[in-house]
Design a protein with these regions (language model features):
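Anionic-ligand binding patches
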Residues: 22-28, 61-213
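Residue-level detector of anion-binding/catalytic polar loops
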Residues: 46-48, 210
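Intrinsic-disorder-associated, low-complexity terminal segments enriched in Asp/Asn/His/Tyr and depleted
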Residues: 10, 15-20
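N-terminal beta1-alpha1 ligand-phosphate binding loop
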Residues: 25-45
């Protein structure tokens, strides 16, 4: 956790500002990702879903960890249209050799991206943010190392043609058929799927949101 400006550490970072925050029980997930919905539901939370339209353009030279937190904050604020609710936004990216790998734009790019991470270890970073009204009350990010086995061109093309990787950062789905390409995971598995549950659940509880409410 950091409480003053500075360089972000390599692992989870969290900013808190709960001094005047009213305890709320209504939760909104500002995400169109079905994986995040499943994770949050599996954690026992009741919530509504909004899919805010947010510009996800990468700023040249921006660090990936700061980028995902920025986008998560923008999503949470865009979804904060109900004053009596806490809104959760999140954004996930894959980083290989310092290069951000977003969602592939088609099958060819998906196959190429999958082959580029095959036989290597990449970093998955997910940023998250909680908003109430027009302000962010807490945010942070989590990193996970993922080692992949080698993927040959035929295998990559077949997987891309299945459609599964087309809306996934890094062009694979850990919770789906893409799991067969993963050889090991160093860090939270849920973070790779799209939401680091431990810090998010803790933050939601601090915001007055409890599982099962």
């Amino acid at each position: 956790c950091i409480t003053s400006p500075g360089v972000l550490p390599d692992r989870t970072v969290s900013h808190r500002n709960h001094a005047n925050m009213a305890r709320m029980t209504k939760l909104i997930l500002a995400s169109s990702s079905p994986r995040r919905r499943l994770l949050l539901r599996a954690a026992g939370f009741d919530f509504e879903v909004e899919s805010p339209d947010v510009d996800e353009t990468v700023i040249e030279g921006e660090d990936p960890d700061r980028m995902v937190v920025r986008l998560a904050r923008n999503k949470a604020l865009a979804g904060a249209t109900t004053p009596d609710a806490v809104v959760l936004g999140a954004d996930t990216t894959v980083v290989l050799d310092g290069r951000i790998l977003g969602k592939p734009e088609g099958e060819a790019e998906a196959a190429e991206m999958l082959q580029s991470i095959g036989g290597r270890t990449h970093v998955v970073i997910t940023g998250w943010a909680l908003a109430q009204g027009a302000r962010i009350v807490e945010d942070g990010f989590e990193t996970t190392l993922v080692a992949m086995r080698s993927v040959d061109p035929v295998e990559a093309a077949a997987y891309a043609a299945s459609g599964e990787p087309l809306d996934k950062a890094g062009a694979y789905a850990l919770q789906g058929d893409g799991a067969r390409f993963v050889s090991s995971i160093g860090g939270p598995r849920s973070n790779v799927v799209g939401l680091p549950l431990k810090p998010v659940v803790e933050a939601l509880r601090r915001a007055g949101i409890e599982p099962g409410l």
